Amino acid sequence: AGLPCLTSASDSRTRKTTRTVEAISASKDGRDWMGINQNAANRYFEFFLRNGSLNRLATGEVRREVKLGNSRIDFLVGNTYVEVKTPLITLPAPEGTARVKGSRFQSFDRLIRHMGELKDSLASGKKAKIVLCYLYDANPFTPPRPDGVNNKILDAARAAEIAGVERWQVNLSIDRFGVSLIRYFKSRPYTSGA
């Protein structure tokens, strides 16, 4: 009575399981897939970078895991640092789908550090972008309202944006045939106080 899943095989001897769940479907017929493998998101993103599908976002030589200050940033593409985040906090689900209450993500320290490093990189003439990479066709990201828990991350995001760090969104589609790019776009700016 679980959800339909798309899995991939692994021949690693160190894993506890032989399969990885790549995507789930909240629909019983398994038509609407949502990718959940955050480890794969950077590989997918890199593929679309290298084949030129994301050329409005960044172009140039693609380097992975580039040191910047005290952090490792996912990509340096030409003159642009690109940090990819794959949010799984709110996955779309049909009405009536059970949801866990009170399981809120509250560890933003790494993301805040990355935003600061990206902001600081602008002084050297580099460009910097944070990409929200959704493994389904997500609505354009809207920052949550400040609530006491998320104030630090919202302040860091605003400060990075004011300094010139751009925020982009990439929506990918996963099905049993593979991964495809649905759309990508520069995100709307944060508004003050929201």
What do these predicted ranges mean?
Residues A1-A40:
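Interdomain/boundary linker segments immediately adjacent to catalytic/signaling cores
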Residues A26-I36, A93-S107:
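Short histidine-centered catalytic/ligand-binding loop motif
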Residues S27-R64:
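Acidic-basic catalytic patches of nuclease active cores, encompassing PD-(D/E)XK
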Residues L49, Y81, Q106-G116:
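Conserved mixed alpha/beta catalytic, RNA-binding, or beta-rich assembly cores of soluble enzyme
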Residues R63-I73, F108, L118:
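Charge/polar-rich, low-complexity and marginally structured segments
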Residues V66, V77, V84-T86, L132-Y134, ...:
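Short, structured patches in soluble enzyme cores that scaffold and shape functional sites
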Residues I73-K101, L118:
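Conserved catalytic cores of phosphodiester-cleaving nucleases, focusing on short active-site segments
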Residues G116, L122-A194:
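Non-catalytic C-terminal interaction segments of nucleic acid-processing enzymes
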